């Protein structure tokens, strides 16, 4: 199998294409185009009758897609979150869907996008810079409790309260407008330790996830993807942290495995699975990590949609939605959680 151009190294490239099992005349959707590494691989396997739909909420990614694939009649390009993929494709019409979650390498590498604590830039963090509040705008008006809740829920940051108090105190003196300001402030209040991880890592992740509603989009997008797939279609999802992977894992299991039964209660209907798990967690091997260290935290999961049982829509048979981790933190809890 050919490899993507060296300018962009998509994670788990071969494993994604193997998981999707691209066919010559199939219809595929890349819900997170980025710089198109995986999309190029899909196109290599499509014939003249195949079709690829690409989506991204980032206008820079859409510009790259139009420049790269705008002349290819097999490709249609759509700006927007994959949470809205149901507005782009009809139900049960797609052979394979890829969701490559989180922030892209170009977003991290360009200081002006405001995602990186290692490169000074405007404190923005929006994947779609034309929509919603920037990180700076939110931090300027959120209460210390709201900031602490976000840092804990989306970054599992044990020092969330300490960091939140420091942010509120500092903004009273001067506005927080730059990524370096925030990163330095967080580092200054964190306990010294031996970790090689930057002290602002969890906080930047948490604020980014909140600003972009990433976990909300993921839950909505997984439901939409399942509805869009044909029977026999494949869903491949790459996650980069435990919050994302937990949602993906539980979603796939919910449609593939019967929930625990309660012997005291009669079963209204027998469970009919809608998905079959194709693989467990797939991670990058040492060869890939030597080329692309950012693949270290990537986890790929693949599932295949099954034929629905008679009289069972399949999509409504759930054990309940995954709770959103944006839950209030009991006031009695301190910084160590």
Curated annotation (Swiss-Prot):
The keyword Translocase does not apply. Keywords: Cytoplasm, Methyltransferase, rRNA processing, S-adenosyl-L-methionine, Transferase. SUPFAM superfamilies: Putative methyltransferase TM0872, insert domain (SSF81799), S-adenosyl-L-methionine-dependent methyltransferases (SSF53335). It holds the Pfam family Methyltransf_5. Its EC number is 2.1.1.199. One of its GO terms (biological process) is rRNA base methylation. Its main location: cytoplasm. Signal peptide: none annotated. S-adenosyl-L-methionine binds at residues 36-38, 56, 82, 100, 107. Specifically methylates the N4 position of cytidine in position 1402 (C1402) of 16S rRNA. PANTHER family: 12S RRNA N4-METHYLCYTIDINE METHYLTRANSFERASE, S-ADENOSYL-METHYLTRANSFERASE MRAW. This is Ribosomal RNA small subunit methyltransferase H. It comes from Xanthomonas oryzae pv. oryzae (strain PXO99A).
